[in-house]
């Protein structure tokens, strides 16, 4: 294990002790954010991550969210949020407006993920993207034994539910980034709440992955 991986594990553990309510991938994201950063959270939901980062990292945080009920929840928390889809929300920001732009568990629902990530890297110094991993061994076994499309770990949604998710694996996303020329600045692989090493079998073992991308 490298020193950076050990440091990341320690930070995630410390954050988990203070915020048991955040999803494991959001705790991993929080461990990457430095105090005082300017942060944009795409598809920020009800603002749990932004509120946590404002309280514990003193970030200048903004969110973009489509659902009106989630936008209202953010407003009640005092979070700066705009309602709209990601393409409309991103185009209004000048280049270099943020230190980190976050996209958590949303990639499977995007019609044009390449465009969104390019926009993230335009307005931010880095993009932090978390994905559910349909390549996890339980998903593979479920497909083999039942003949049905499996639900991704942490994403309990039937294949015909709206909005519809496009299944992807860690390997799929890594190859996608290579094709699009997105430079990787590191990744965190999670098995539930626990981080696992970057090994040949990570696509089998990880339930979620957090990727850091640079322009």
Where are these regions (language model features)?
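Class I SAM-dependent methyltransferase Rossmann-like catalytic core
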Residues: 7-21
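Conserved alpha-helix/loop element of class I SAM-dependent methyltransferases that forms part
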Residues: 20-36
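Class I SAM-dependent methyltransferase "Motif I" SAM/SAH-binding loop
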Residues: 43-45
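Class I SAM-dependent methyltransferase SAM/SAH-binding core
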Residues: 52-89
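Short conserved loop adjoining the S-adenosyl-L-methionine
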Residues: 89-95
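S-adenosyl-L-methionine-dependent methyltransferase catalytic module, highlighting the catalytic core
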Residues: 114-119, 126-215
């Amino acid at each position: 294990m490298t020193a950076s991986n050990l440091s990341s594990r320690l930070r995630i553990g410390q954050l988990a002790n203070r915020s048991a309510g955040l999803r494991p991938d959001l705790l991993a994201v929080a461990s990457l954010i430095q105090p005082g950063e300017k942060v944009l959270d795409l598809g920020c939901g009800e603002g749990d991550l932004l509120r946590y980062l404002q309280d514990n990292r003193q970030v200048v945080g903004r969110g973009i969210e489509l659902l009106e009920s989630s936008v209202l929840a953010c407003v009640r928390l005092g979070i700066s949020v705009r309602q709209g889809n990601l393409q409309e929300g991103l185009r209004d920001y000048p280049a270099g407006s943020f230190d980190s732009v976050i996209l958590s568990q949303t990639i499977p629902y995007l019609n044009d993920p390449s465009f969104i990530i390019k926009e993230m890297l335009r307005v931010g110094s880095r993009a932090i993207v978390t994905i559910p991993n349909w390549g996890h061994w339980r998903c593979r076994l479920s497909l083999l034994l039942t003949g049905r499309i499996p639900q991704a770990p942490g994403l309990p949604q039937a294949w015909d539910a709206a909005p519809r998710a496009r299944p992807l694996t860690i390997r799929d996303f890594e190859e996608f980034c290579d094709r699009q020329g997105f430079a990787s600045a590191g990744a965190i692989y999670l098995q539930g709440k626990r981080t696992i090493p970057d090994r040949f079998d990570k696509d089998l073992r990880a339930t979620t992955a957090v990727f850091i991308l640079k322009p």
